[in-house]
Amino acid sequence: MKVRIATYASHSALQILKGAKDEGFETIAFGSSKVKPLYTKYFPVADYFIEEKYPEEELLNLNAVVVPTGSFVAHLGIELVENMKVPYFGNKRVLRWESDRNLERKWLKKAGIRVPEVYEDPDDIEKPVIVKPHGAKGGKGYFLAKDPEDFWRKAEKFLGIKRKEDLKNIQIQEYVLGVPVYPHYFYSKVREELELMSIDRRYESNVDAIGRIPAKDQLEFDMDITYTVIGNIPIVLRESLLMDVIEAGERVVKAAEELMGGLWGPFCLEGVFTPDLEFVVFEISARIVAGTNIFVNGSPYTWLRYDRPVSTGRRIAMEIREAIENDMLEKVLT
């Protein structure tokens, strides 16, 4: 039976569906009727559009393979995703490790990757920290704090939190000074190899606008810095740093094999390079990230490897096609 590729109509669905069509698959988008024209008229990448949050029976009848986006769990909920009957590209067990900051930290440390210090008690803050609420919300609610007093003032202002009992869904991380770098990887279970797909950095409001205001005016305005993501900027990394990034990806894949039965498909390590050229990672996104949308026509790194335009969305479709051709489809699905 013909396999079709499906995804929720959000985040990086345009790229995923375009890549699937480029590899000869029929495509399915599902979600809000409000966005239907985006996928069928303005950017006609969906052969089918189903106006439901999660149309399980229709997807099963269409022999769909669901490809998760970076906002998949945010829209559908982790319980629904873990229990869906439609074949899912990737390892669902990764979702718990990715969404739980303590498990995520355990994963990164097992991989031998430098991670920021974490404060369990805000009253112990003794250096600049960045405070992150639970869940992937594009940096919304993130804030900097320099000491306990500053933390509590901003926690109430941005998150409505006044008591320690309400802190269970936030993480207080050491703020590591450096250049933000977000390498995008793809691990092929068919080929058993890691690929560096592309690299980006985020464009965030208002932190990336602060520099346009003279320092004396910043002090007068008494502004609080926020980190809401509004877009992404491509990066070509210094060539001497590429092996650091690639080796970090290899170690994450190896640790995932031991902890949760493997990580395959696209993922991203979100971190910074310090002035000492140390790669410090503060988060992992174990699915396609929005930063790959810059590279719908491929990146410098995929061009070097494939000598043709290959986006992360297309690479997913290539993996599914190769799995079908090698009678390995069940091995890349859960």
From Swiss-Prot:
ATP binds at residues 132-142, 173-176, 204. Homotrimer and homohexamer. InterPro entries: ATP-grasp, ATP_grasp_subdomain_1, IMP_biosynth_PurP, IMP_biosynth_PurP_C, IMP_biosynth_PurP_N, PreATP-grasp_dom_sf. PANTHER family: 5-FORMAMINOIMIDAZOLE-4-CARBOXAMIDE-1-(BETA)-D-RIBOFURANOSYL 5'-MONOPHOSPHATE SYNTHETASE, 5-FORMAMINOIMIDAZOLE-4-CARBOXAMIDE-1-(BETA)-D-RIBOFURANOSYL 5'-MONOPHOSPHATE SYNTHETASE-RELATED. Gene3D superfamilies: 3.40.50.20, ATP-grasp fold, A domain, ATP-grasp fold, B domain. This is 5-formaminoimidazole-4-carboxamide-1-(beta)-D-ribofuranosyl 5'-monophosphate synthetase. Mg(2+) binds at E270, E283. One of its GO terms (molecular function) is magnesium ion binding. One of its GO terms (biological process) is 'de novo' IMP biosynthetic process. Keywords: ATP-binding, Ligase, Magnesium, Manganese, Metal-binding, Nucleotide-binding, Purine biosynthesis. The gene is purP. The keyword rRNA-binding does not apply. Pathway: Purine metabolism; IMP biosynthesis via de novo pathway; 5-formamido-1-(5-phospho-D-ribosyl)imidazole-4-carboxamide from 5-amino-1-(5-phospho-D-ribosyl)imidazole-4-carboxamide (formate route): step 1/1. Its EC number is 6.3.4.23. Residues 78-325 form the ATP-grasp domain. Belongs to the phosphohexose mutase family. 5-amino-1-(5-phospho-beta-D-ribosyl)imidazole-4-carboxamide binds at S10, H11, S71, H75, N232. Binds 1 Mg(2+) or Mn(2+) ion per subunit. Coiled coil: none annotated. It comes from Pyrococcus furiosus (strain ATCC 43587 / DSM 3638 / JCM 8422 / Vc1). Its cofactor is Mg(2+); Mn(2+). Catalyzes the ATP- and formate-dependent formylation of 5-aminoimidazole-4-carboxamide-1-beta-d-ribofuranosyl 5'-monophosphate (AICAR) to 5-formaminoimidazole-4-carboxamide-1-beta-d-ribofuranosyl 5'-monophosphate (FAICAR) in the absence of folates. It is an enzyme of class 6 (ligase). It catalyses: 5-amino-1-(5-phospho-beta-D-ribosyl)imidazole-4-carboxamide + formate + ATP = 5-formamido-1-(5-phospho-D-ribosyl)imidazole-4-carboxamide + ADP + phosphate.
